[in-house]
Every structure is written in structure tokens, then in C-alpha cells.
Amino acid sequence: MKKFLITGGSGFIGTNFINLISKKNIKILNIDKISKISTLEKYKKILKKKNYTFKKYNLSDKNKTYKIINSFKPDAIINFAAESHVDRSISDPIYFISNNINSSTNIFFAYKEYYKKKKIKLYHISTDEVYGSKKKGSSVENDKYDPSSPYSASKASTDLIAKAFNRTYNTEIKIL
């Protein structure tokens, strides 16, 4: 049975992703600190599934994050973890920037250490917000980053840190 470690899986997108994969033969560990917008109530059925485990945890400690990864031994890591409310990021930018950048960097660091033992991929979930507002058409991956809020700037920063980890440490962080 494959094992997926999911960070931030209690938000809107993470919940829907877990709903989808929980029907497959995949063992799931969801790590989430449960913020104000988390949707844990929306998947009470999943909580009862034998292939699903939830662990309430704040990703602020890179060493503890590594211990969780190392003990679970995932085949893939999917990082949804981020505070994502644009308006709240405008009223409290320091919290958003600090939380999103530090949490993702801690995940990348822990992944880098685990990657030395087992070559797995980490899928870092980004947002179209990193490209800013388009007057016409939609954004594509090669577009220039043009964040328009502290939230989107924090996500753009984590994307760039992921790219730097790949270049510096030869890891396989995929930005989606």
C-alpha cells in the first residue's frame, strides 16, 4: 500500500484531495494545525476510514517535522499547508508571511533530509495568485510572478525556495 503524507490537508483544496484519494488503496497521514478556515468537519466520514490518520501539528519545528516524515515513511509528500485568506493577509501580513514561508521551508528541509534515505517526490501546491491579476487570458507556468497581496507574495516566496532546494540539494520538489 502506498503512503502519502499530506500537510495542510484540512483546508478546502486539501479536503477535496483527501476525499478523492481516500477511496484508493493509499495510506494517508494528514498533518494540519487546524486554522480558522480548516474544514475538518466536512470530512467526518474520512476520519473513520482505516487508511486515514489525522495528526494535529504546527509545522514550525523542522526537526519534529522530519521525525514525523521519517517514522511514517511516505512514498510521496503533498504540501497544501498555508494560510490562504487574502483579506486577512492584508490586515496581518507578518503572520501570513512568517507562517507560510517558515512552514514550507521546514517541510522542504525535513523532506531534503528524508530524501537522502528514500528518493520520493514532494508536491508543493502553489496558487494562481502568484501571477497577479490578468486583464486577458489566464496565466501559464512561465509567466513572471507578480503577487498582489501578502498571501500571494508568501506563496511566490515558497515556490522560489522550493526551486532553490531543487538546485542546491538536488531534490525533487514539484510545484503545482
Where are these regions (language model features)?
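N-terminal Rossmann-like NAD(P)+-binding domain of SDR-like oxidoreductases, especially those catalyzing
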Residues: M1-L176
